[in-house]
Amino acid sequence: MTDKRNNLIWIDLEMTGLSPENDRIIEIATIVTDAELNVLAEGPVLAVHQSDALLDGMDEWNTTHHNNSGLVARVKASTVNDAAAESQTIAFLEQYVEAGMSPMCGNSICQDRRFLANYMPKLEAFFHYRNLDVSTLKELARRWKPDILPGFSKENKHLALDDIRESIAELVYYREHFIDA
């Protein structure tokens, strides 16, 4: 078993929109890797129930993508609320990661952290205050080494678990082609 203090928590949320004050979490997934980005475990993938009124209020982009992916139907059928999703996710993470040790890992992860702070504060507090944001490397590569960008493409399914897998693969790509680590 790897050292729980060095394992990394990868998280992705799907939301009804981009405003943590008005929108809500509709899906959460996590993956734990070791420090070398080897997957140790995949956590629960949870559709979080929200009201029909909230789902009907989504903008066109979210309505189209979340309906096409089947997520809206899963959210409507779900009996999991924010608190249950939070506790199930923490119970999974505690098996692999020491609380307060892992940065929050993912793509544009600040947005996920904002939603967690509002709706799943215990889970947000489980992370270290630092972020490991793959989108930072993408922005730096775009400016400093744009020739490597075509070498990695994403499917952008906008399903939490698939998005995490792509984020990990993207970081592996940047480690090899940009950071040279």
Curated annotation (Swiss-Prot):
Residues 8-171 form the Exonuclease domain. GO terms for biological process: DNA metabolic process. One of its GO terms (cellular component) is cytoplasm. Gene3D superfamilies: Ribonuclease H-like superfamily/Ribonuclease H. Its EC number is 3.1.15.-. One of its GO terms (molecular function) is 3'-5'-RNA exonuclease activity. InterPro entries: Exonuclease_RNaseT/DNA_pol3, Oligoribonuclease, RNaseH-like_sf, RNaseH_sf. It is found in: Cytoplasm. It comes from the Bacteria. Keywords: Cytoplasm, Exonuclease, Hydrolase, Nuclease. Its main location: cytoplasm. It is an enzyme of class 3 (hydrolase). The active site is at Y129. 3'-to-5' exoribonuclease specific for small oligoribonucleotides. Belongs to the oligoribonuclease family. This is Oligoribonuclease. It comes from Alcanivorax borkumensis (strain ATCC 700651 / DSM 11573 / NCIMB 13689 / SK2). The lineage of its organism: Bacteria, Pseudomonadati, Pseudomonadota, Gammaproteobacteria, Oceanospirillales.
